[in-house]
Amino acid sequence: MKKSLLGLTFASLMFSAGSAVAADYKIDKEGQHAFVNFRIQHLGYSWLYGTFKDFDGTFTFDEKNPAADKVNVTINTTSVDTNHAERDKHLRSADFLNTTKYPQATFTSTSVKKDGDELDITGDLTLNGVTKPVTLEAKLIGQGDDPWGGKRAGFEAEGKIKLKDFNIKTDLGPASQEVDLIISVEGVQQK
């Protein structure tokens, strides 16, 4: 009887520990709960904001073990939108994103580290045919049950990339060499 009770207790502990491990989430872009935005200075006088309207992604989140976290995102670069059709056409050209040749950008995390209240998500960003490491500083906004019987987790992340690192050589002046990435995602836990 002792062995059976011990085995049952051990199995219960393993099941409980298993439910606290990493969970897989699909980014909820269909419900408009996810955004991949950017901004760049315009000639050093103002900020120009834009977004990518078409992207898909998943992430794995384990609050107790960030090293187990993973992020994978694919962006349709032709979906760039700065609220100005002529500028968007120029951004899709070979001067910038070269979407005819490189219609997708991808981000695949390689490590996640906890830094106080933030997560440093380092990964490989492939943009314009070039792959470079990029680190995003992310913060958990919230997590828990949703009204439809599911679970959700939301994050906001920021990072910077240099245009020249991704073979974008158009010179918009010294104040316009870096792009700020501003990303907000809500994920629906997969069962």
Swiss-Prot record:
SUPFAM superfamilies: YceI-like. It comes from the Bacteria. The keyword Magnesium does not apply. Keywords: Periplasm, Signal. It is found in: Periplasm. Belongs to the UPF0312 family. Type 1 subfamily. The lineage of its organism: Bacteria, Pseudomonadati, Pseudomonadota, Gammaproteobacteria, Enterobacterales. Its main location: periplasm. Residues 1-22 form the signal peptide. This is Protein YceI. Gene3D superfamilies: Lipid/polyisoprenoid-binding, YceI-like. InterPro entries: Lipid/polyisoprenoid-bd_YceI, TTHA0802/YceI-like_sf, UPF0312/YceI. GO terms for cellular component: periplasmic space. NCBIfam families: PRK03757.1. PANTHER family: PROTEIN YCEI (PTHR34406:SF1). It comes from Shigella flexneri.
